[in-house]
Amino acid sequence: MLEVIFLGTGGIMPNRERNVPAIALRYKGEIILFDVGEGTMRQMSTAKLSPMKVEKIFITHFHGDHYLGLAALIQTMNLWNREKPLHIYGPKYTFRFIQNFLNSGFFRPGFDIHVHEIGEVRLKFGDYEIWSFKVEHGIPALGYVFKEKDKRGKFLPEKLAEYGLSEGPILGKLEKQGQIEWNGRIIRLEDVTGPRRKGVKVVYTGDTEPCERTRLFAENADLLIHEATYLRPEDRGDSYHTTVGEACEIAKKAKVKLLALFHRAFRYTYDEYMAKARELCDVPFVIPKDFDVLTFKSGRWEMRNLLEDWQ
């Protein structure tokens, strides 16, 4: 099961309704952070997410609303006597900015921090991978893909019977080794299982103007979290951002299953923004609020709000 927890959904500056960008992915007990705007530690505390379970942080770019919460997060980890290393990934200049951050006050973390300055790469971590891709924001900036590894197909009872196999350690051996010798025959895993099942794919753009690489990397994604700062092109001015209509068009071309419109400018109310999205979007979409959670189960998304759960 995968959970996407929206800790901050607004753009540029926080207000009473929403914090600046931070997204937590919870997968098999691990928490992966994508962007850490100011106040992320408080948002995590409200969401009952432990910073000690965060091993990797992926920063899309170094505008303040996407990374200024990093210092408080690291200091909290230090106060809680963290020992595990922390890995921070980001675009060009990541090492310089993190080093400046750590040298800006009178504290030193008592755990190792590994900084990874990356371009377009494919990083493998056990049962999932993280892909990075370049986006267009006027400064070095990356989007990220979380891709769960594909899973084997389900064991087919009729095929197991055909080969004289039954539930038990022998199936575990077959799954681990890929093939076994049984009753004088070589049996491969694919001989007794159905089609492989696609792992879940989640794409987060960070800040960007519309670009072809987003469509390419978002192809057939289960969830595309695309910035849609503005409602109208004339509101955008010269900034490198995307409108709601443009984000919906990219999602349609990429054939994503669900679009999450993200990074709403503080000038728009939720109702105003939702009305425009309903007018322009002909793909399934949501407009997450702070503390909304999207849970991927049995091939579909379910959304709830953590604060409402606890009332």
Swiss-Prot record:
Reaction(s) catalysed by this chain, per the record, are:
Endonucleolytic cleavage of RNA, removing extra 3' nucleotides from tRNA precursor, generating 3' termini of tRNAs. A 3'-hydroxy group is left at the tRNA terminus and a 5'-phosphoryl group is left at the trailer molecule
Q: Which cofactor does it need?
A: Zn(2+)
The UniProt entry annotates the active site at: D65 (proton acceptor)
Q: Where does Zn(2+) 2 bind?
A: D65, H66, D207, H263
**Assigned EC number:** 3.1.26.11
The protein's UniProt keywords, in alphabetical order, are: Endonuclease, Hydrolase, Metal-binding, Nuclease, tRNA processing, Zinc
Return the similarity comment.
Belongs to the RNase Z family.
- HAMAP family for the chain: RNase_Z_BN
Assembly, in brief, is: Homodimer.
What is the protein's given name?
Ribonuclease Z
Query: Which species is the source of this protein?
Result: Thermococcus onnurineus (strain NA1)
